[in-house]
Regions:
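Electropositive polyanion-binding surfaces
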Residues: 1-192
Length: 192
């Protein structure tokens, strides 16, 4: 019931967030909606569109996009916003676990025939960035509205464990590692 298929109606929750030109979020709007996609786009097609400005976006399958120009403009705007949000998030010192994930190939009988690293391009990262923005908007709304909700709290790390971590890091050949906790500094330092 949650998968998107062209022209199929699906229940969803809308999180609409206005952003300024610097990537700062405005007041979000939340609403239950019925969503109907116009066509099937896959990550590779969207990435091809990003890599080839001026070309029309094409959908796969039997349901062509109703308005490829409108979708192309929306995707172009979304790509620009993604780049701003990614820059802002990096400046905040968040980690980007850009680790390879396996992608399996299957035979008709369901047996695995191969495995390779899955590609992670801007089309993938755009969706991830927008999901993070939606999650943050919901968390801010629940917190400022004093609505009780469950969330995960990460306690401060134990000093002895941090000392062991920094000793291990210093034993590596990696350059420019912090020697201890840094309150202000580069984004990667803030992550520690």
């Amino acid at each position: 019931l949650c998968s998107l298929a062209p022209l199929q109606k699906r229940l969803a929750m809308l999180v609409e967030i206005p952003f300024d030109s610097q990537g700062a979020p405005g007041k979000p709007r939340f609403a239950p909606i019925v969503m109907q996609s116009w066509g099937r786009l896959i990550y590779e097609d969207v990435q091809h569109f990003f890599d080839n400005p001026g070309q029309k976006i094409l959908a796969r399958g039997k349901n062509p996009l109703r308005d490829a120009d409108q979708i192309g403009k929306m995707l172009g705007d979304a790509h620009e916003l993604y780049k701003i949000l990614a820059r802002v998030r990096k400046e905040r010192g968040t980690l980007d676990f850009d680790l390879p994930e396996p992608q399996y190939s299957f035979a008709e009988d369901g047996s695995i025939t191969g495995v390779r690293n899955a590609e992670r391009n801007d089309a993938h990262k755009l969706i991830e960035e927008f999901m993070i923005a939606a999650n943050e908007a919901v968390a801010r709304h629940l917190s400022t509205s004093k609505i009780p909700f469950l969330y995960r709290v990460h306690p401060a790390p134990e000093e002895t464990r941090l000392a062991a971590l920094f000793a291990t890091l210093q034993a590596t050949a990696v350059e420019n590692l912090p020697a201890g906790i840094i309150k202000n500094g580069q984004p990667a330092e803030n992550a520690l």
